[in-house]
């Protein structure tokens, strides 16, 4: 596991931060007992292998990511994410639930997020168009609307098509409101609201269509996709339809001068004072994680975007989500500053009644959606010019402990006329 600062690896990070107070956590965290919440297998002789439930004594929190502990007389490094403060035991539901379901479903029980999603016209109208354009194919069919929220997709099915039944499955408390909406609109003989986690679902029959709006930041965050794939394997007929049918993640190198100026250059001379020593901590504080609500302007793209991953949701396996990596090469088409990379996703819906497919694209060349764009800022901007090449790789790695979270590792090489100019690498947690 690497730290979140650029070009560092754990061994460099350990050497450079040994006894470095700037990186140790407050003393009050040390000399306390911690419980291991997830097995860990050491990857070198400075680390300890531990099992879930082991108790350790924290000796030195050398960084946010790695802690030096004593376990039954043996000392070594373990990932801090695998430890929980045994003396300050939170509710079991919080600590022992790597899916954080109580917090997760709690966030969907109020109207805030549902209002945001329903207010997203490109998102919601895409689903309406999919139902509209396939209405005759849906006649007499069984449909599963997974994570239905307020039931909007199920309402579209009842309003624009004549399916046999729609199973509107929703685990959060909002399902109580969804029930009332379905009754009030007189469609309860067609739309069956089931307040249940999809994983525990019991339906009277397999379904012809599994439709869901499961996409999170960078497509995968929340990993609701795992629930969708499990429901596919359990409830979708062999020749059934997945909507969305495919999903893509796109990336482009970009300038983000205003972001960099507002968050870092600001410290050069606020009110004509030199606060520039705050620029490094500002960079770490504001750019260690991606900005999930960034709006990339098309003119800030430094090259054509590329498609990193193209997922087929009829065949994708949950295990493939653990780690996905892809190489990329961008040909810079504009002189400028490379401040970072921006990512977004698109999803495609197979059309059952004519050639082609419908698409919801959340990128900078399509109508803005509530997902906006995800900006990965480098620690330092890099000068690039037309015809430079930015090649490298990206790794999406699912968090082995917190199962709704992931990290994105970006590695890049900037070359000019075949001569290597700049090399870099940075790990971005989303969000743990
Ligand atoms: N599109 C975004 N960002 N969020 C996805 C939308 C999430 C909605 O789906 C529900 N949901 C998520 N996972 C499950 C599950 N396994 N079983 C039943 N309901 C579920 C949540 O409570 C939200 O209402």
Curated annotation (Swiss-Prot):
CDD domains, per the entry: AdoMet_MTases, SH3_PRMT2
Gene Ontology CC terms: cytoplasm; nucleus
Compositional bias per record (Low complexity), positions renumbered to this chain: 1-11
Domain SAM-dependent MTase PRMT-type, first and last residues per copy: 101-405
Localization per record: Cytoplasm; Nucleus
Binding-site residues, S-adenosyl-L-methionine: 114, 123, 147, 170, 199
Protein's recorded name: Protein arginine N-methyltransferase 2
Originating organism: Xenopus laevis (African clawed frog)
GO MF term list: histone H3R8 methyltransferase activity; histone methyltransferase activity; nuclear estrogen receptor binding; protein-arginine N-methyltransferase activity; protein-arginine omega-N asymmetric methyltransferase activity
Protein task: Arginine methyltransferase that methylates the guanidino nitrogens of arginyl residues in proteins such as histones. Involved in growth regulation. Involved in embryonic dorsal development.
Gene behind the chain: prmt2
Keyword annotations from UniProtKB, A to Z: Cytoplasm, Methyltransferase, Nucleus, S-adenosyl-L-methionine, SH3 domain, Transferase
Entry's family note: Belongs to the class I-like SAM-binding methyltransferase superfamily. Protein arginine N-methyltransferase family.
Catalytic reactions on record: L-arginyl-[protein] + 2 S-adenosyl-L-methionine = N(omega),N(omega)-dimethyl-L-arginyl-[protein] + 2 S-adenosyl-L-homocysteine + 2 H(+)
EC number: 2.1.1.319
Assembly and oligomerization: Interacts with ctnnb1.
Region (Disordered): 1-22
